[in-house]
Structures are given as C-alpha cells and as structure tokens.
Regions:
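An N-terminal hydrophobic leader/cap segment in hydrolases
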Residues: 1-17
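Conserved HGGG/HGGXW glycine-rich cap/lid loop of the alpha/beta-hydrolase fold
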Residues: 21, 25-79
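Active-site loop/oxyanion-hole signature of alpha/beta-hydrolase fold enzymes
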Residues: 21-22, 68-114
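Structural signature of beta-strand start/N-cap positions in the alpha/beta core
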Residues: 37, 65, 109-112, 133-136
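Short, hydrophobic alpha-helix immediately C-terminal to the catalytic nucleophile
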Residues: 52, 100, 124-128
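Catalytic nucleophile serine of serine hydrolases
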Residues: 77, 117, 141
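Gly/Ala-rich beta-loop-alpha elbow adjacent to hydrolase catalytic centers
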Residues: 115, 119, 123
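Flexible "cap/lid" loop of the alpha/beta hydrolase fold
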Residues: 124-129, 134-164
Length: 164
C-alpha cells in the first residue's frame, strides 16, 4: 500500500559523456527547474548533493534551471578515461575548461555559475576566462586568494616534532 504522504522530488539525475582538453569524462549531474541556467559547483571532497535544497526550492526553481554536477573522482562522476596512464591533476585550467565544456555539452547559454569554497574560488577564473558567455557568478564561502593551508604551529618542536 502506497504511503499517503509520499512525494517525488523534482530533481532528475543523468550522466553525460564529454571531452575536455583531450580527455573523456563521464559526468553525473542533477537538475531541476526552468529558466536562467544556474550551474552549481560543489566544495572539494563533496558532490552535487550539497545543493539538494537549492534543487528542491520552488522559489528558486520557478526562475532558474538549477544544474549541479559531480567533479571527476567525486560523487557519481568517474575519473577521466585512462586516468592511471598519466598523472591526473585537477588544476584551475583543467577545472575551468571542464566546467565550460560541461555547460556547452548541455546546450546551456549564458549561465550563472555559483560555487562554494573551492568551487566559489574557481568562479572568479570562470568569469575571467568566459566573461562574454556567462550572466554572472556567485561565490559562496570563497576567496580570491588564501595563504597555504599549512598550519605552522604543528611544526613547533614541542608538538610531535612536526609529525602528524
């Protein structure tokens, strides 16, 4: 017997196969809504589920086509084809090209690109590289520059001799 309060969410998930900088990727993404395309970039170590509340917000999805994808090696996205044959580094150039090639593969025009933390920081480079192709950027908990993530205090001789 079906549950009387059960309701399907409007989010639809799919895979798309794209090529970026000569490498092939199988990328998972979720989308919901109609209107202005809003590309959502997750933080390092997470995936598109980070934006599940945005994808389910009727006030947002009534105005925007919200699209959140999993970076390669995150969530349900595979690493690039033959990734073990050469060193794989997710550099700024690789990431910004992948974002651009992703929205082109979907046929998206003039998106707003929104990212959180690392995803937010890369929105600045997306804006610099593709300013004629985007509507705008939104950086959440992002920064244009951050000092190294090393905590020099941990290298003090009184604290484990700098060993973790």
């Amino acid at each position: 017997m079906p549950q009387p309060d059960a309701a399907l969410e409007p989010i639809v998930g799919r895979y798309i196969n794209i090529e970026s900088l000569g490498r092939k990727y199988r990328i998972f993404y979720e989308e919901s809504g109609e209107g202005i395309p809003l590309i959502c970039l997750h933080t390092a170590g997470t995936d598109s589920r980070q934006f599940r509340h945005v994808l389910n917000d009727p006030e947002i999805t009534s105005k925007c086509r919200v699209i959140a994808f999993d970076m390669p090696l995150h969530g349900r996205s595979n690493p690039p084809d033959n990734w073990w044959l050469e060193k794989y580094e997710l550099t700024t150039k690789v990431y910004t090209n992948l974002i651009h090639d992703f929205w082109l593969a979907l046929g998206v025009e003039n998106p707003i690109v929104m990212g959180c933390s690392m995803g937010g920081a890369v929105t600045l480079q997306v804006a610099a590289d593709y300013q004629e192709e985007i509507t705008g950027i939104i950086g959440l908990e992002s920064t244009a520059f951050a000092e190294g993530r090393d905590n020099n205090f941990l290298h003090h001789p009184a604290i484990h001799g700098g060993e973790l």
